Amino acid sequence: MKKNILIFGLVSGVFLAAFVLSISFLSKVFHGHLDNEVVGYSAMIIAFSFIFVGTRNFRDKYNQGMVTFGQAFLVGLGISLIGSSLYVGSWLIEFYCFMPDYMDKYSAALIQKAQQSHLSPETLQKRLDSINSMSSMYKNPVMVVLFTYMEVLPVGIVISLISALILKRKPRTGATDYANNNVSY
């Protein structure tokens, strides 16, 4: 099970890392008009499709065609953690080496958007305080790691749950008992 988790986690993580490292290039090509959320979550879903493949591979090749919901979920969770960790690591490289002003630009864009919206003064002030709080928290590397995991890991967990529900397969006790002549009349 560990080898299966490692292989499919690395495949998923390499895909996510390649996406993260290419996002600054894509933003420059599209002159900032790239909807990063849609593209980002689409890339996460594609990368985490390896959770389904890895869980099915574990069930069919290593577990005699059977897997419980719990086993399938643990396989998916392991793949998610490895893939998410590579995503976080690549974001840290991108952020600290190539985009150290990312949070300043992102906060400025959020503030401008909030000021252009038609919010009441109280709501606007709450939004601005929230943006400034997030920006100051992002100065701490631990918070950068936590925020980045919170961005990617929930997607992996949801896909792990869905994969476990679809792929769970318990042995049929009646059929195996009859086939092994263990049936009592």
Briefly describe each language-model feature range:
Residues 1-58:
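Transmembrane alpha-helical insertion/packing segments
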Residues 3, 7-11, 15, 74-83, ...:
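Alpha-helical transmembrane segments of multi-pass membrane proteins
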Residues 131-154:
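Individual transmembrane alpha-helix segments
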Residues 161-185:
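Juxtamembrane interface at the cytosolic side of transmembrane helices
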Residues 15-23, 47-51, 83-87, 91, ...:
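Alpha-helical transmembrane segments of multipass membrane proteins
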